[in-house]
From Swiss-Prot:
Stated name of the protein: DNA polymerase I
Temperature dependence: Optimum temperature is 65 degrees Celsius.
Record Gene3D superfamilies: 3.30.70.370, 5' to 3' exonuclease, C-terminal subdomain (1.10.150.20), 5'-nuclease (3.40.50.1010), Ribonuclease H-like superfamily/Ribonuclease H (3.30.420.10), Taq DNA Polymerase, Chain T, domain 4 (1.20.1060.10)
Reaction(s) catalysed (UniProt annotation): DNA(n) + a 2'-deoxyribonucleoside 5'-triphosphate = DNA(n+1) + diphosphate
Gene: polA
Subunit (UniProt): Single-chain monomer with multiple functions.
Residue numbers spanned by region Subtilisin large fragment: 289-876
Pfam family, one: DNA_polI_exo1
Described purpose of this protein according to its UniProt entry: In addition to polymerase activity, the recombinant enzyme has strand displacement and 5'-3' exonuclease activity, but lacks proofreading 3'-5' exonuclease activity.
Length: 876
């Protein structure tokens, strides 16, 4: 194999990594973002290049031989941030662990070390890769040397060969120093010739080749001022070229044999990653070494032929293993228990037929600790078995401690808490279509290890939750809610399939009519769903203005089409066609596919541990996303009907809950007063920002005020509001300014919560749910701004989510206490959907709003609107 040398500009890559990534730190408070980014780059290079030789070059100090020639060389550079300086020793440790030599040389820069070693390697016939963020190094490009310059971040790079240097600059690599000689380089404080920029410099070098030739040919150059500058600053041009030239014969005391890559010291790498908290790299290392076959310490357990009393303790960790994505119809393949007496595996056909075990499962006084108890509860319900007494759910506990860490299985949570004696589900079963259940001994050991992990992790996670004041959030909100959601999922929602099919036929007719009209306006038939064909019709044939292009042609995205709508009638029809098509494929056909063949219902699955705000989402199907803006979309709700004759659908939703939460959290007197007086908050806001009386508020003013109100909740900028309302940024800024003048407490809250997030690293909801914001201190403006908006919004949106969850629990209790048949079916953001016998509706009209409005006590009243009817559509 041909020798390949990789040369890395250590300082440059470290700087790039530091500024590309948010400030990260380990549990000791040591900053690690530059080391993290450097590691990403290093792993990528080693995997892709597979070098035989490698070297990382560093700058030795601030003074080099260039300073002796020009004292102000690199003058004016900003001080290295202390958060970066403290990471250079860690970088050295990283390179030692990887067994990659690092080298620096007094009075020389890293560039000179790289230039020298590249020249030596070239002479020996090596292929050479240079990695840096400094474009000066493109002067090294040659048939054997490729220079890779980091662009955004550290893993996005541009490769420079002699051909690409010519393509990019119009000059050869050798002429890069001449370019710097004429135009200078602000980043290195190389002066160049005043008045000469890149364009002029390139033009001169294309004509004359070198700085020396340019200076020898001044009389042939056009432009008196240019000639004058070249004559006056002749010495500066030659000096600048000298400063820009990379030294290729520095006294580097390394041979090529000294930088042979021998592979990492795995033990040291793992130890360093653990110290730095680089869990994702540790996970990747585990996967690459086939973690599924990694030997674990032995664990005693019994594969039982029958259920015994010692298994059925007063408290035990329980695993009811359901293998498959959709637990409504996936099989239960095994059951495991761990308690103070031991660890046990039970075959499902044995356990689920044993009266003692079934009684234990349903006994509220027998405490169970589990992972994703809802999944097990639903799977058991399909077998007519009830699960009660769950006192700890590892999935929900881990979710509350850090909602950004998606806990896919027990092993993922265990790893986060330094518990290693369990394998991942993927390692045991495989994934996707290749997922299979292993032989019984392997399965039994896996499930027992999971049960043992759950048993071991309850105490440390509960301790952490107590320290965060989140223990009640788990035990009084999320865990009780899991049982309620299990009931809702199993109950399902009845679907009128005939009505859905009828809607599908109607949509097909509408689509065909819209399609015909589009063809008429286009003057030809074409594939409307093909962006390429659509682009050709709109921009080539109809000559509409081109607003945006993609790699493959014209952009026909929704935002582009909306801007084009005023230009031609066809655009409006295309947008309508797309909307109808999505309704047909996603909602009509999609819903029909998931209707249960026996129950005639759709049984969704609620994601309780997914969003970082605490809101629920649902899948298979996503019933929280049934469209409401388009009338055809709203009509889909006509297909959702009660499951019993003479029953009705009852819907209740919180009115403006997020704005009410904002009033409470911000303690803004004007906002509080408006809600207490029962004013229309959007009308009130319109009065304030437009300075008009209530009678003079127009529908358009109220619409704009509504956009301001909800925009403020999401920390909207003047640019975002301008886009939403189709007004100028200046007008949007004035709206926001007037809003804050009317509600100063809101402005104070926004400022305070961002500062609090920067100090603590997280924000909390009213019920102590946390969201961590590592990007809140990012040096990248866009990244930091997004984190700041998230800090403003999460306490509001998250508190609203907490409130409706509390209402669901309270409502379930009241329905049971009052022995009503009414049952919860769905939660859709701020709305609860129930079904109930007609004779209970009058009581629900009193009970449901009462319970929802009293779920929590705020400084402003909560308000609930309710409706009922024969379908979900009618309950509006």
């Amino acid at each position: 194999m041909k020798n390949k040398l990789v040369l890395i500009d250590g300082n440059s890559v470290a700087y790039r990594a530091f500024f590309a990534l948010p400030l990260l730190h380990n549990d000791k408070g040591i900053h690690t973002n530059a080391v993290y980014g450097f590691t990403m780059m290093l792993n990528k290079i080693l995997a892709e290049e597979q070098p035989t030789h490698i070297l990382v070059a560093f700058d030795a100090g601030k003074t080099t031989f260039r300073h002796e020639t020009f004292q102000d060389y690199k003058g004016g550079r900003q001080q290295t941030p202390p958060e970066l300086s403290e990471q250079f020793p860690l970088l050295r440790e990283l390179l030692k662990a990887y067994r990659i030599p690092a080298y620096e040389l007094d009075h020389y820069e890293a560039d000179d070390i790289i230039g020298t070693m590249a020249a030596r390697a070239e002479r020996e016939g090596f292929a050479v890769k240079v990695i840096s963020g400094d474009r000066d190094l493109t002067q090294l490009a040659s048939p054997q040397v490729t220079v890779e310059i980091t662009k955004k971040g550290i893993t996005d790079i541009e490769s420079y060969t002699p051909e690409t240097v010519v393509e990019k600059y119009g000059l050869t690599p050798e002429q890069i120093v001449d370019l710097k000689g004429l135009m200078g380089d602000k980043s290195d404080n190389i002066p160049g010739v005043p008045g000469i920029g890149e364009k002029t410099a390139v033009k001169l070098l294309k004509q004359f080749g070198t700085v020396e030739n340019v200076l020898a040919s001044i009389d042939e150059i056009k432009g008196e001022k240019l000639k004058e500058n070249l004559r006056q600053y002749r010495d500066l041009a030659l000096l600048s070229k000298q400063l820009a030239a990379i030294c290729r014969d520095a006294p580097v005391e390394l041979t090529l044999d000294d930088i042979v890559y021998k592979g990492e010291d795995r033990e040291k790498v793992v130890a360093l990653f653990q110290e730095l908290g680089f869990q994702s790299f540790l996970d990747k290392m585990a996967v690459q070494t086939d973690e599924g076959e990694k030997p674990l310490a032995g664990m005693d357990f019994a594969i039982a032929d029958s259920v015994t009393d010692e298994m059925l303790a007063d408290k035990a960790a329980l695993v009811v293993e359901v293998v498959g994505d959709n637990y409504h119809h996936a099989p239960i393949v095994g059951i495991a228990l761990a308690n103070e007496r031991g660890r046990f595996f039970l075959r499902p056909e044995t356990a689920l037929a044993d009266p003692k075990f079934l009684a234990w499962l349903g006994d509220e006084t027998k405490k169970k600790t589990m992972f994703d108890s809802k999944r097990a509860a639903v799977a058991l319900k399909w077998k007519g078995i009830e699960l009660r007494g769950v006192v700890f759910d590892l999935l929900l506990a881990a979710y509350l401690l850090d909602p950004a860490q998606a806990a896919g299985d027990v092993a993922a949570v265990a790893k986060m808490h330094q518990y290693e004696a369990v394998r991942s589900d993927e390692a045991v079963y495989g994934k996707g279509a290749k997922r299979t259940v292993p032989d019984e001994p392997t399965l039994a050991e896996h499930l027992v290890r999971k049960a043992a992990a759950i048993w071991a992790l309850e105490e440390p996670l509960m301790d952490e939750l107590r320290r965060n004041e989140q223990d009640r959030l788990l035990t009084e909100l999320e865990q009780p809610l899991a049982g309620i959601l299990a009931n809702m999922e199993f109950t399902g929602v009845k679907v009128d399939t005939k009505r859905l099919e009828q809607m599908g036929a109607e949509l097909t007719e509408q689509l065909q009519a819209v399609e015909r009209r589009i063809y008429e306006l286009a003057g030809q038939e074409f594939n409307i769903n093909s962006p390429k064909q659509l682009g050709t019709v709109l921009f080539d044939k109809l000559q509409l203005p081109v607003l945006k292009k993609t790699k493959t042609g014209y952009s026909t995205s929704a935002d582009v089409l909306e801007k084009l709508a005023p230009h031609h009638e066809i655009v409006e029809h295309i947008l309508h066609y797309r909307q109808l098509g999505k309704l047909q494929s996603t909602y009509i056909e999609g819903l029909l596919k998931v209707v249960h063949p026996v129950t005639g219902k759709v049984h969704t699955m609620f994601n309780q541990a997914l969003t970082q705000t605490g809101r629920l989402s649902s899948v298979e199907p996503n019933l929280q996303n049934i469209p409401i803006r388009l009338e055809e979309g709203r009509k889909i709700r006509q297909a959702f009907v009660p499951s019993e004759p003479d029953w009705l659908i009852f819907a209740a939703d919180y009115s403006q809950i997020e704005l009410r939460v904002l009033a409470h959290i911000a303690e803004d007197d004007n906002l509080i007063e408006a809600f207490r007086r029962g004013l229309d908050i959007h009308t009130k806001t319109a009065m304030d920002i437009f300075h008009v009386s209530e009678e003079d508020v127009t529908a358009n003013m109220r619409r704009q005020a509504k956009a301001v109100n909800f925009g403020i909740v999401y920390g909207i900028s003047d640019y975002g509001l301008a886009q939403n309302l189709n007004i100028t940024r200046k007008e949007a800024a004035e709206f926001i300014e007037r809003y804050f003048a009317s509600f100063p407490g809101v402005k104070q809250y926004m400022d305070n919560i961002v500062q609090e997030a920067k100090q603590k690293g997280y924000v909390t909801t009213l019920l102590h749910r946390r969201r961590y914001l590592p990007d809140i201190t990012s040096r990248n403006f866009n990244v930091r701004s997004f984190a700041e908006r998230t800090a403003m919004n999460t306490p509001i949106q998250g508190s609203a989510a907490d409130i409706i969850k509390k209402a669901m629990i309270d409502l379930s209790v009241r329905l049971r206490e009052e022995r009503l048949q009414a049952r919860l079916l769905l939660q859709v953001h701020d709305e609860l959907i129930l079904e109930a016998p007609k004779e209970e509706i009058e009581r629900l009209c009193r009970l449901v709003p009462e319970v929802m409005e009293q779920a929590v006590t705020l400084r402003v009243p909560l308000k609930v609107d309710y409706h009922y009817g024969p379908t979900w559509y009618d309950a509006k």
